[in-house]
Amino acid sequence: MKLKGRKIVGGKAEGEVIVSRKPLSFLGGVDPETGIVTDAESDIRGQSIAGKILVFPRGKGSTVGSYVIYALKKNNKAPKAIIVGEAETIVATGAIISDIPMVDGVDVSKLKTGMKVRVDADSGEVEILEDGE
């Protein structure tokens, strides 16, 4: 199955999905040294986003969150790609300065943790390769 969205940052990535059903704040919500989600309100608290395809409805929080995404990339703890239901400037800026493929406008309810997907951000497409859990 292919899901259609909109390119925010071009590029391609393939890998395992980790899904948060709640908005995600990077500042204070993700440890830039480890890639572990630390936000007490997050449904993926304690899990690593490093090397995964990160899926969530939208970002929240401070503009400094963009630099947390950049620090994740510099520390080799960033996600391979970001898929959001609705892009906002904090996450989009972080993905742009970190060169992380990003797509928005995707029906994130169709994705679940453990799936394997291919993201073609250039065309705005997300292809589900394996169903996961």
From Swiss-Prot:
GO terms for biological process: isopentenyl diphosphate biosynthetic process, mevalonate pathway. One of its GO terms (molecular function) is hydro-lyase activity. SUPFAM superfamilies: LeuD/IlvD-like. It comes from the Archaea. It catalyses: (R)-5-phosphomevalonate = (2E)-3-methyl-5-phosphooxypent-2-enoate + H2O. Pathway: Isoprenoid biosynthesis; isopentenyl diphosphate biosynthesis via mevalonate pathway. Its EC number is 4.2.1.182. It is an enzyme of class 4 (lyase). The active site is at S62. Heterodimer composed of a large subunit (PMDh-L) and a small subunit (PMDh-S). Component of a hydro-lyase that catalyzes the dehydration of mevalonate 5-phosphate (MVA5P) to form trans-anhydromevalonate 5-phosphate (tAHMP). Involved in the archaeal mevalonate (MVA) pathway, which provides fundamental precursors for isoprenoid biosynthesis, such as isopentenyl diphosphate (IPP) and dimethylallyl diphosphate (DMAPP). Belongs to the AcnX type II small subunit family. This is Phosphomevalonate dehydratase small subunit. It comes from Thermococcus kodakarensis (strain ATCC BAA-918 / JCM 12380 / KOD1). The lineage of its organism: Archaea, Methanobacteriati, Methanobacteriota, Thermococci, Thermococcales.
